[in-house]
């Protein structure tokens, strides 16, 4: 693993009196794509929401680029360099594609790749063809691409993706994998929550498996491939 960008130790999270995460610890290196795998209800989404300070109560240590961010509000976490793409996409349905992208625009960070509408349209050619279409007239896959592109307009250093392949046609999933690998090539780090092991294998350097709000496994994709008993125990439907 390259130099650590995100270092999470002992992350706990609650919704009311219900505890959802139990001491989640993980690391992500610069320019690395890491998968957080698990079934529905395992704690994947809550992990991302806890990292973004979007859960009612949390505890533990979260360091980003060597800076403690555990106590920061969400907008300060975004300003520090984390971008979040939720599962429900949240496009602005009355705005055009171009207008949605402008909503997310932030100044570039020194020494990092600069994301503009032009290079995002090259990354997602379908969006270029519908730049004047409103978000409400787009398919689920098109909305997913738009949400990722809008997040990149915020010039993040690390992108958190929640189930980016869920419910999408195979061709769109393939385009999504290509986009994530292009993000990595541009120097971004990515933490992607997934149930689709095939998709995760195509894009990830390493993987964690979460079950019952606890990390049960960590290793490279090759190591996970060599341990079918792990896949059967935690990922089989």
Locate each region found by the language model:
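Helix-to-loop junction immediately C-terminal to a conserved catalytic motif
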Residues: 52
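The feature captures the beta-strand-to-loop junction immediately N-terminal to the Walker
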Residues: 37-39
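ABC ATPase C-loop
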Residues: 151-152
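Conserved ABC transporter NBD signature motif
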Residues: 60-68, 80, 113-117
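Catalytic Walker B motif of ABC-type/P-loop ATPase nucleotide-binding domains
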Residues: 159-163
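ABC-type ATPase nucleotide-binding domains, specifically the catalytic core motifs of the NBD
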Residues: 16, 72, 97-115, 123-128, ...
């Amino acid at each position: 693993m390259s130099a650590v960008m995100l270092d999470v130790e002992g992350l706990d999270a609650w919704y009311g009196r219900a505890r959802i995460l139990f001491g989640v610890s993980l690391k992500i290196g610069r320019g690395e794509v890491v998968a957080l795998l698990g079934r529905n209800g395992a704690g994947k989404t809550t992990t991302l929401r806890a990292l973004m300070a979007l859960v009612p109560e949390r505890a533990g240590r979260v360091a980003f680029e060597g800076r403690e961010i555990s106590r920061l509000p969400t907008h300060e976490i975004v300003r520090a360099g984390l971008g979040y793409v939720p599962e429900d996409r949240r496009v602005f349905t009355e705005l055009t594609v171009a207008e949605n992208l402008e909503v997310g625009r932030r100044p570039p960070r020194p020494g990092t790749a600069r994301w503009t509408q032009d290079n995002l349209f090259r990354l997602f050619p379908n969006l270029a063809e519908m730049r004047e279409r409103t978000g409400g007239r787009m398919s689920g896959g098109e909305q997913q691409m738009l949400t990722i592109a809008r997040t990149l307009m915020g010039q993040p250093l690390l992108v958190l993706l929640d189930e980016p392949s869920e419910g999408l046609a195979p061709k769109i999933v393939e385009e999504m994998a290509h986009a994530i690998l292009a993000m990595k090539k541009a120097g971004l780090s990515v933490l992607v929550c997934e149930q689709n092991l095939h998709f995760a294998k195509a894009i990830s350097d390493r993987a964690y498996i979460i079950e019952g709000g606890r990390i049960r496994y960590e290793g490279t994709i090759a190591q996970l491939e060599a341990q079918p008993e792990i896949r059967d125990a935690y990922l089989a439907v």
